[in-house]
């Protein structure tokens, strides 16, 4: 009889990072003889094509009600009770061999109902932690705010109006207690928590989830897409004629991603230097100074890889991040990275693949970039690509998950792999 894998995530769309990950894990699992099922929010993604069998959860009205409970009463993850009961009934019928949680926030699940069910069955549970929401009373990142309340107990949340925004109530103190009770209810041997960075594991070891069993599995990328390219096409398309090209990429540009820092850096550029920013909105593009070329968000990954290849240095002045994929993509295209010492952003950067500077030190970031330019990109290109081939292959990271599933089903212990091995 085939083993059954059930993954749970709010989105299924491949143009979202977690949607792509759950689909590709499912596809690889099927190649290795598993039946693959994915439960997701029908209210957010509708009925979508997928090679795995899908279990749509809730509907648009359910998402809207959950959104209202979030906006008014700070009850994110505490609505959608009926939709979650229906999901539990499907899970009971399906009897999966492994349950793999991804994001359980996203306006579609009532997490106390889900975890009461998980605590009462014997099925191994894997939980990939893509952000910090699981162990805070409200926010999904706290680095930029400099908040450490999550270590001992939240309350009077400084980020109440940020995702998942609450316009009226601050329930962060009770949310913290509710999450702690639910997320520590499973026996340690049945829940394996998978942070996507060593940094996040270190943070969780200081949270109410400190006694969990952890195994870090980094995210990977498609190395057959992100590889060194000739740059003539994008150079002409975007009129990039300067001698030295610095690149920055984000899905959304905001203060937390380093927008203000890059504007300061642009004011320091020489005439033979240009900053290219990918992911800007039309409004942001109109605001850019003349020595910054703004490119709106593109789903054309081949063009994005060409832009990575064109740049001499990739800049990532992020103030909060777990394990940014943009760093991996740049390095895979042979381009060294200069990043702030932020979260897991440093984990792909070695002396051979880039440099790390302190948060907010824009002058040091530009100096590091110029040091790389002076040394020559040729010094880094091969080392970057070799490092990517060894560490960033998405299929190898997905195999790590399949190996984890098999170990759990055999009742074997989960050994944390040395991140430097």
Describe the role of every protein-language-model region.
Residues 351, 355-362, 371-377:
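Conserved acidic donor-binding segment of nucleotide-sugar-dependent glycosyltransferases
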Residues 378-391, 400-403, 407:
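A short, well-ordered alpha-helix in the C-terminal region of glycosyltransferases
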Residues 279-305:
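Nucleotide-activated donor-binding/catalytic signature segment of Leloir-type glycosyltransferases, i.e.
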Residues 194, 239-257, 263-266:
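Conserved donor-binding/catalytic core segment of Leloir-type glycosyltransferases
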Residues 306-311:
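Short alpha-helical donor nucleotide-sugar binding micro-motif in glycosyltransferases
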Residues 336-339:
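Short hydrophobic beta-strand element within catalytic cores of glycosyltransferases
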Residues 286, 341-356:
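Short acidic/histidine- and often glycine-rich active-site loop of Leloir-type glycosyltransferases
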Residues 319:
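Aromatic "clamp/platform" in nucleotide-sugar-dependent glycosyltransferases that forms part
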